[in-house]
Structure formats: C-alpha cells, structure tokens
Amino acid sequence: MEKLRKFFREVIAEAKKISWPSRKELLTSFGVVLVILAVTSVYFFVLDFIFSGVVSAIFKALGIG
C-alpha cells in the first residue's frame, strides 16, 4: 500500500511541473495544425483524382470497365 501512495505522490509532483501553453501559443499551434491538415487533405485529394483517372483509363483501354 505504501508503494501505491508513493506512486500517487510522485504523479502529483510531476503534474505540478506541467507548463501549459498560453492562449496565444495554443491558438498559434492550432492554426498551424489546421493549415497542415488542409494542405495534406488537398494533396491527397489531388493524388486520388490523378490515380483514379489513370486507373479508369487503363481499365477503359483494356475493355474492363
């Protein structure tokens, strides 16, 4: 039981060391994440569009679809 108490005391001590970001830092990081997400989404959309067109052309040339 003493080990469990020690564990929780150490967890609380470590939790007190956490430094939370300021509102400005949080919003800046959030904005960066949104921009990267949007760019990545557009990138994969374009790749999907290109590959689906290529595959459709191949299937059409082979008379499959």
Swiss-Prot record:
UniProt membrane topology term: Single-pass membrane protein
Spans through the membrane: 35-51
InterPro entries noted in UniProt: SecE_bac (IPR005807), SecE_sf (IPR038379), Translocase_SecE/Sec61-g (IPR001901)
Name this protein carries in UniProt: Protein translocase subunit SecE
Domain of life per record: Bacteria
SUBUNIT field: Component of the Sec protein translocase complex. Heterotrimer consisting of SecY, SecE and SecG subunits. The heterotrimers can form oligomers, although 1 heterotrimer is thought to be able to translocate proteins. Interacts with SecDF, and other proteins may be involved. The channel interacts with SecA via subunit SecY.
GO biological process, one term: protein secretion
Record keywords, A-Z: Cell inner membrane, Cell membrane, Membrane, Protein transport, Translocation, Transmembrane, Transmembrane helix, Transport
Family, per entry: Belongs to the SecE/SEC61-gamma family.
Side Extracellular, residues: 52-65
Gene Ontology CC: plasma membrane
Summary of the function given for this chain in its UniProt record: Essential subunit of the protein translocation channel SecYEG. Clamps together the 2 halves of SecY. May contact the channel plug during translocation.
GO molecular function, one term: protein transmembrane transporter activity
